[in-house]
UniProtKB/Swiss-Prot annotation:
HAMAP family, per the entry: Ribosomal_bL34 (MF_00391)
Encoding gene per record: rpmH
Family: Belongs to the bacterial ribosomal protein bL34 family.
Keyword Ribonucleoprotein: yes
Keyword Cytoplasm: no
GO cellular component: ribonucleoprotein complex; ribosome
Highest taxon of source: Bacteria
Species for this entry: Halalkalibacterium halodurans (strain ATCC BAA-125 / DSM 18197 / FERM 7344 / JCM 9153 / C-125) (Bacillus halodurans)
Protein name per UniProt: Large ribosomal subunit protein bL34
PROSITE patterns: RIBOSOMAL_L34 (PS00784)
InterPro entries, per database record: Ribosomal_bL34 (IPR000271), Ribosomal_bL34_CS (IPR020939)
GO MF annotation list: structural constituent of ribosome
Protein backbone atom coordinates (compact mmCIF):
# COMPACT_ATOMS: atom_id res chain seq x y z
CA UNK A 1 0.00 0.00 0.00
CA UNK A 2 1.13 3.55 -0.69
CA UNK A 3 0.60 6.53 1.55
CA UNK A 4 -2.85 8.13 1.76
CA UNK A 5 -3.01 10.54 -1.18
CA UNK A 6 -4.95 13.26 0.66
CA UNK A 7 -2.44 15.31 2.65
CA UNK A 8 -4.53 18.17 4.08
CA UNK A 9 -2.97 21.63 3.89
CA UNK A 10 -5.26 24.61 4.45
CA UNK A 11 -2.90 27.13 2.88
CA UNK A 12 -2.65 25.17 -0.36
CA UNK A 13 -6.40 24.51 -0.29
CA UNK A 14 -7.15 28.25 -0.21
CA UNK A 15 -4.45 29.11 -2.75
CA UNK A 16 -5.75 26.60 -5.27
CA UNK A 17 -9.50 26.46 -4.65
CA UNK A 18 -10.26 29.62 -2.68
CA UNK A 19 -12.61 32.44 -3.65
CA UNK A 20 -9.85 34.88 -4.52
CA UNK A 21 -8.10 32.25 -6.61
CA UNK A 22 -11.35 31.70 -8.55
CA UNK A 23 -11.90 35.43 -9.02
CA UNK A 24 -8.38 35.94 -10.36
CA UNK A 25 -9.03 34.19 -13.69
CA UNK A 26 -11.74 34.39 -16.31
CA UNK A 27 -12.46 30.67 -16.10
CA UNK A 28 -12.50 30.83 -12.31
CA UNK A 29 -15.23 33.46 -12.53
CA UNK A 30 -17.13 31.11 -14.84
CA UNK A 31 -16.90 28.42 -12.16
CA UNK A 32 -18.37 30.78 -9.56
CA UNK A 33 -21.13 31.92 -11.92
CA UNK A 34 -22.03 28.31 -12.64
CA UNK A 35 -22.15 27.47 -8.93
CA UNK A 36 -24.29 30.54 -8.20
CA UNK A 37 -26.68 29.56 -10.97
CA UNK A 38 -26.93 26.05 -9.56
CA UNK A 39 -27.66 27.51 -6.12
CA UNK A 40 -24.68 26.09 -4.27
CA UNK A 41 -24.58 27.12 -0.62
CA UNK A 42 -20.76 27.10 -0.71
CA UNK A 43 -19.17 28.68 -3.80
CA UNK A 44 -15.54 27.94 -3.06
CA UNK A 45 -13.14 26.56 -0.47
Amino acid sequence: MGKPTFQPNNRKRKKVHGFRARMSTKNGRKVLARRRKKGRKVLSA
